[in-house]
């Protein structure tokens, strides 16, 4: 973990400085159109509390797409930079924008509720733009914390996860969880469930696919030091499209135990490949997949273990 943090610090130092100072004297005449902020724009050095009213005064309609408001509602789930930068960015958009869009009904309603709490009426236009999934997640070169790096349904993939060919080490099935490692994603409950099922059902593995996020030092240590890592427990820090599709399509069950989501794209990615899903009702997850996924409490590791093991023995359990 210390070496990883040092490497990340060196990468940040090597990044070129943002050209905001060089551009400070430049001006652009804009008197029409729409300015739309997307994704993690709160890291942009142009303060939206100044930019948005200036654009509005020039006749430009301003708009935003919210993916969630978790840094405001649950700051403990975010890193320090996001906790500091997101609230003023979000509140500026809520105060000045003529168009507010959410990636789910839940996210949109949360944004409108906060705007109303400012004493403001609803914007002139608001709506929802849902995400979509095709089973490929657009991720990079696969990396594992231990052992050789897998590269898909080829010899580099651990034999326990091979879906074709003969292998004495191949598991009977595996549960896959695709998400960044961060507190909100609740990997902890899956590890707790895994520790419950792994001894009595050694044929069922657990696969994590996701990069290291923030506030996860204890979780990463637990994964890296787990005695079953590399035999029944696997972690891919990244996966390219082919590897992702292979791992997800070959899974017995896809699990998403998040405390809350602004949408929940991995649920759609799994369902698109015909993989049963177990998830929660946190945030917008109740909107995703309708009544198809099995939904469990986010903190009940025994219920997760029982449901996942039961599906290994009864393939129709999560399909009915």
Regions found by a protein language model. Name each.
Residues 1-320:
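Carbohydrate transferase catalytic cores enriched for Leloir-type hexosyltransferases
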